[in-house]
Regions:
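Anionic N-terminal interaction surfaces
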Residues: 2-5, 13-87
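Detector for Asparagine
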Residues: 3, 41, 45, 122, ...
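Charged, low-complexity, helix/coiled-coil-prone segments
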Residues: 13-14, 104-116, 159-161, 165-172
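Short, flexible/disordered intra-domain loops and linkers
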Residues: 24-31, 100, 148-155
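Phosphoinositide-binding peripheral membrane targeting modules
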Residues: 74-79, 86-141
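Terminal and domain-flanking low-complexity segments
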Residues: 131-134, 141-194
Length: 194
């Protein structure tokens, strides 16, 4: 019996070491990865005056439950973006990954004057139009590791993530202040009544 406990503990320790080593290697690879360079090049090439923007990798995951009766289904949808930002101005370039190849679409522009409201919650930034209808939600995180087909990049972007957080805070204050929004919850509720 004691041998089984010792073997079990040893297996857990070995598994922990393997996972830790993999995470550490992925983080080191992501600090100056090919994917990070591609994101910066995409921003430079497709965003007007792209070199004047901070470039980052952004994602959005949407998890939903559905079904009825005895059947419950879960759906997770993923979006990937090259994010370009500077004070008062945001571009999102949709990305797609197919068999390791990175492709991109036309950039979407969101200037502070185009937005009706911005909400920040738990690291997510949600943009709303002038009628306070949700446009989209995204987040930029410091560590992205290639875990599976739904997490396809190794990109470490601590400085960019911190800069995006400051940008998002500033954009929220500017946009909400310009549109007379002091209570986001009340503004959302009023928009639903329309």
């Amino acid at each position: 019996m004691t041998n089984y406990i010792i073997i079990g503990i040893a297996a857990v320790v070995i598994l922990f070491i393997i996972v830790y080593v993999k995470m550490t290697l992925d983080e080191k690879k992501g600090a100056d990865s090919e994917e990070k360079r591609k994101i910066k090049n995409i921003v430079r090439n497709v965003v007007p005056e792209g070199e004047s923007y901070t470039a980052a990798y952004g994602t959005r995951e949407d998890f939903s439950l559905g079904g009825g009766g005895r059947t419950i289904t879960t759906t997770t949808r993923y979006w990937y973006y090259a994010v370009a930002f500077k004070p008062g101005d945001l571009y999102l370039v949709p990305l797609s990954f197919d068999g390791g190849d990175l492709s991109y679409g036309e950039p979407l522009h969101y200037g502070k004057d185009d937005l009706g409201m911005v909400d920040l919650k738990n690291g997510y930034m949600t943009l709303y139009d002038k009628d306070r209808k949700e446009i989209m939600t995204l987040f930029v995180v410091a560590s992205n590791t290639k875990d599976d087909q739904y997490h396809p990049v190794n990109i470490q972007q601590k400085e960019e993530a911190e800069a995006f957080k400051q940008f998002a805070d500033s954009l929220m204050q500017e946009v909400n202040g310009a549109n007379g929004i002091s209570d986001i919850k009340a503004a959302k509720k009023a928009a639903r009544k329309k």
